[in-house]
Amino acid sequence: MLYLHGIGHFHPENVITNRFLEELEIGTDEAWILERVGIRERRTVLPLDYIRQTKNRDLRASYEASLYRNAETAAFAARMALDRAGLQPSDIGLVIAGSSSPAFLTPAEAAMAAAELGIDAPCFDVNSACTTFGMQVDLLNRMMADKLPPFVLIVQPENVTRMIDYSDRSSAVLFGDGSTAAVLSASVKARAAFVESECGTNPSGFDKVAIPTGGYFRQDGNAVQGFAIRRMTESIRSLLSAFGKGNDGRFRFIGHQANMGALLT
C-alpha cells in the first residue's frame, strides 16, 4: 500500500492554440486538428515568437530560448504537492524524477529538482516516457516499506515542445508542456492510497515512438494508437473484474490524454 499525501502540477503561461498552428502554414487548420486529435490548446516553455520565427529548426537554440528549466517546472509542481501534503522540503527523504525531455544526460533530473527545492536526500531517475508517473508509483509499491523514508517525492517535468519540429504538422499539433509531482509514503497513512499496480511493456515496438538523442520526436501514429487502445481496453477490463464489483458504481477511469479519438474509442 502506497499512500498519496499530496499532488501538484505546473504548466507554463504561453498557449499554443490551433489558430497559432494554422498561422504557421504547415498544412493544418483547427477543424483538421479537432477532428484528428481533439486538442484545442497546449502550453509551452518556449516563446511563441521563437516558434513562429524558427519553427524550432535548431534544437540547441530551443534550450537557450526556453523560459523555464526542467528543475524549475518540477519545483513549481513539487511545492504545490508539498503544500497540499502539509509538508516542507526538509521532510522529503527520497526524490525520484523522470522526463522524456531532459536537459542533461547526467546529472539526474531528480538531483537538479532537489537542488532547486533545497532538498538534501538521495535522488535518482526513473523514466518511462508517457508512463513515467505510473512506473515510479509501481516501483515504490514493490519496495520494502521499512526501507523507504517516511516521505518520498516523485516529479515528472515534461517540456517536450523543445523537441518538436514545428514544420511537421503530425507532431506539432500533439504536444504541450507540463510538470507533475506527488508526495507518497509507505508508512504514514493518508486518505488516498494506491492499492494495486501493474506494469507492462512491448519491447518489440521500441521503435514505434522515439525522441533520438539530438533529434526530434517521431512516431508511427497508427501503430501506436492501435496498440494504446488495445492495451488500455484490456487493462480497464482487468481492473473492472478485480475492483469494479461492490464499489457502488464509483469506478472511474483516467486515461492517457494524448488523443481524444483514442479515449473515445
Language-model segment annotations:
Residues 51, 77-93, 234-251:
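Phosphate/pyrophosphate-binding loops at sites that engage ATP/ADP/AMP, CoA/4′-phosphopantetheine
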Residues 98-105, 252-265:
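Glycine-rich phosphate-binding loops at beta-strand->alpha-helix junctions
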Residues 4, 33, 81, 92-95, ...:
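Buried hydrophobic positions in well-ordered alpha/beta secondary-structure cores of metabolic enzymes
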Residues 10, 98-103, 128-132, 156-162, ...:
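Acidic, glycine-rich active-site loops and adjacent beta-strand->loop/helix elements
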Residues 16, 106-108, 137, 164-168:
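Short acidic, glycine/serine/threonine-rich loops at helix termini
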Residues 1-69, 168-230, 234-238, 242:
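Condensing-enzyme catalytic core mediating Claisen C-C bond formation in acyl metabolism
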